[in-house]
């Protein structure tokens, strides 16, 4: 199975700007990328980083400057077998969570994200294509139905938890065990309780 990890190497994670400056966002994004890629390796698959610009890392990199949809759909179109796509900001991902995704039956296997996104999927049907705009999980369900694909969804807290907003950093500190969590702690982030709600402070 070809495993693809899309990554914005230019200006990643802009919604974290209230708490991280641009160089910090790049460093933190690369820490999350490493967590995801190493987790994929740990279950005996090799990740291919699908990046918007060249990225120095220990994994194969394919540079595609086009939109996320165009870049991923090209990977799907040229594949001669199953393709898995796992987003680079799944800082809580574990080998067990990915193994569940990869082993699940179905021609299309979807891992919904919080807020309506699609954080990972496996496509075993050659006609499946992506549309990541807006609530993409509903679009991907519809696309799978239109091509007649047998579709399975994997309900996983760790696959559903992507890191886009400052509030998401609390989940990384609470549940993360990899480089991203370590990076936050090394840069002065810790948990804070505010009226019973967990957040982060620096």
Swiss-Prot record:
It is an enzyme of class 2 (transferase). SUPFAM superfamilies: Nucleotide-diphospho-sugar transferases. InterPro entries: CofC, Nucleotide-diphossugar_trans. Disulfide bonds: none annotated. Its EC number is 2.7.7.68. GO terms for biological process: F420-0 metabolic process. The keyword Transmembrane helix does not apply. Keywords: GTP-binding, Nucleotide-binding, Nucleotidyltransferase, Transferase. Gene3D superfamilies: 6.10.140.50, Spore Coat Polysaccharide Biosynthesis Protein SpsA, Chain A. It catalyses: (2S)-2-phospholactate + GTP + H(+) = (2S)-lactyl-2-diphospho-5'-guanosine + diphosphate. Pathway: Cofactor biosynthesis; coenzyme F420 biosynthesis. GO terms for molecular function: GTP binding; phospholactate guanylyltransferase activity. Belongs to the CofC family. Guanylyltransferase that catalyzes the activation of (2S)-2-phospholactate (2-PL) as (2S)-lactyl-2-diphospho-5'-guanosine, via the condensation of 2-PL with GTP. It is involved in the biosynthesis of coenzyme F420, a hydride carrier cofactor. Homodimer. This is 2-phospho-L-lactate guanylyltransferase. It comes from Halorhabdus utahensis (strain DSM 12940 / JCM 11049 / AX-2). The gene is cofC.
């Amino acid at each position: 199975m070809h495993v693809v990890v899309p990554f914005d190497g230019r200006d990643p994670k802009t919604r974290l700007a209230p708490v991280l400056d641009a160089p910090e966002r790049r460093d933190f994004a690369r820490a999350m990328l490493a967590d995801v890629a190493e987790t994929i390796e740990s279950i005996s698959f090799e990740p291919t980083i699908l990046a918007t610009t060249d990225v120095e890392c220990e994994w194969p990199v394919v540079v595609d400057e086009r939109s996320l949809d165009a870049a991923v759909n090209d990977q799907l179109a040229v594949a001669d077998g199953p393709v898995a796509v796992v987003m680079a900001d799944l800082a809580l991902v574990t080998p067990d969570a990915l193994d569940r995704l990869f082993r699940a039956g179905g021609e299309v296997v979807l891992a919904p994200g919080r807020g309506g996104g699609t954080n990972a999927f496996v496509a075993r049907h050659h006609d499946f294509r992506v549309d990541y705009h807006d609530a993409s999980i509903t679009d991907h369900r519809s696309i799978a139905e239109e091509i007649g694909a047998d579709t399975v969804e994997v309900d996983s807290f760790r696959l559903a938890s992507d890191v886009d907003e400052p509030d998401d950093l609390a989940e990384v500190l609470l549940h993360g065990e990899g480089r991203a969590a370590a990076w936050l702690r090394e840069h002065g982030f810790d948990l804070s309780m505010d009226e019973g709600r967990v957040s982060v402070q620096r």
